[in-house]
Design a protein with these regions (language model features):
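Extended interfacial segments that mediate partner engagement and assembly in macromolecular machines
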Residues: 1-66, 73, 82-89
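PRPP/pyrophosphate-binding module of the type I phosphoribosyltransferase fold
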Residues: 34, 70-155
Length: 155
């Protein structure tokens, strides 16, 4: 109920609540290791305009504030897709194939941010994992050492 209010009900302030829960739940990197870069799963611009905010970005930013870690919008959704929750399991992968790419505007700084670094891909809900897999492929191709997925809930 709270997650639906956050995702669809305009309750942006719940990002801090969910970030605190994630902070308590997830395993920290080994001492002395560079902290991971937090990267939100992006919304398509049309969905962002309709909703008025990007809940994954709000969540990633709030988690970054709790942990003192960097959050960067490195990915862009270049193709509108159906919500994964409404897609049949077999079509979820096809639904998000080639739907994401790295933001070109970041140029060389993108390589410096990602080169050999661990990334936590942040989203509100994990359905089949197809969206996370597609985003992870983009980040790994760009030089991330590893990508871990951090979500509030699984559907």
């Amino acid at each position: 109920e709270w997650l639906l209010a956050f995702k669809h009900g305009g309750r942006r302030e719940l990002a801090e609540f969910f970030a605190q829960r994630l902070h308590e739940r997830v395993t920290l990197p080994e001492p002395g290791c560079e902290p991971p870069l937090l990267v939100p799963v992006p919304l398509h611009r049309w969905r962002h305009l309709a909703r008025g905010y990007d809940q994954a970005f709000l969540l990633a930013r709030a988690l970054g504030e709790v942990r003192g870690w960097d959050c960067a919008r490195l990915l862009k959704r270049v193709r509108a897709t159906r919500p994964q929750g409404s897609a049949l399991a077999l079509s979820r992968e096809a639904n998000v194939r080639a739907a994401f790419e790295l933001r070109r505007s970041l140029g060389r700084s993108l390589q410096a941010m990602l080169d050999g670094r661990s990334v936590w891909l942040v989203d509100d809900v994990l359905t089949s994992g197809a969206t996370a897999d597609e985003c992870a492929r983009c980040l790994l191709r760009a030089g991330a050492a590893r990508v871990e997925v951090v979500v509030v809930a699984r559907a």
